[in-house]
Amino acid sequence: MRIALVVEYDGSQYHGWQAQTGLHTIQQAVEFALSKVADSSISVVCAGRTDTGVHATNQVIHFDCEKDRSIRAWIHGANTFLPKDICVKWGKEMPENFHARYSAVSRRYRYVIYNGAIRPGLLRGNVTWQYRQLDHRLMQQGGQCLLGENDFTSFRSVECQSNTPMRNIHQLQVTRHGDLVVLDITANAFLHHMVRNIAGVLIAVGSGKHPVGWVKDVLNAKDRKLGAETAPSYGLYLVQVTYPKEFGLLQNNPGPLFLWEK
């Protein structure tokens, strides 16, 4: 039996998603909880391996288990054993050809910036703080040259292990909601640190450090050294993973909860 679950987590206190010996990770916490419910060892596969400090409102995972458990039992049972900053939101039994990572057709991230003179208290760890005034309209304008299929060498980390730098960005929007500036981006897949490097470049444009046309120059250069500083991890959220309709996976509100839909 193959089960898919949608997981939400605050990544502030974790060394990313992927299990690593001697480190506190999301995957290890999730597998521990599910193994308790199954009364046997469970290994999970996720849609997107988020980095240290990165959050998710709708991470999708799958696992195989022969134990007879209802979806309700998987959800509520796992939540009993999970720490308070991780929860399972939704679940469904899936066909054997479903794969949380390889069946996905797109991933959507939101990068949230608190743009105010004083650093935030309540939202610390959940937003990136920029005290310099950002013009979200310039950021929006600059980001449009990244749409479509491009070589994103300038926006990948030096540790990126992907075989190709080619990625297809489906949509990119930068909006302002009071003191919050939100980068909303969807692509078929993302390179290591790609969203944070895009955010860094757009922040440089929004603050007036570079002109709008510089974004295109960075893209064309295919050289990571010519881009901006990588934006911090703690403003980044994996908010949606899209699959073919045949799998019938629910599309939840992207979130995070302190944002509102426009």
UniProtKB/Swiss-Prot annotation:
Residues engaged in binding substrate: Y109
Annotated protein name in UniProt: tRNA pseudouridine synthase A
EC top class named in words: isomerase
GO BP, sorted A to Z: tRNA pseudouridine synthesis
Subunit structure: Homodimer.
Family as reported in the entry's similarity comment: Belongs to the tRNA pseudouridine synthase TruA family.
E.C. no: 5.4.99.12
CDD domains linked to this entry: PseudoU_synth_EcTruA
GO molecular function, one term: tRNA pseudouridine(38-40) synthase activity
Assigned keywords, A-Z: Isomerase, tRNA processing
Organism classification: Bacteria, Pseudomonadati, Pseudomonadota, Gammaproteobacteria, Legionellales
Reaction(s) catalysed (UniProt annotation): uridine(38/39/40) in tRNA = pseudouridine(38/39/40) in tRNA
Role of this protein: Formation of pseudouridine at positions 38, 39 and 40 in the anticodon stem and loop of transfer RNAs.
Gene name tied to this protein: truA
Annotated Pfam families: PseudoU_synth_1
Active site: D51 (nucleophile)
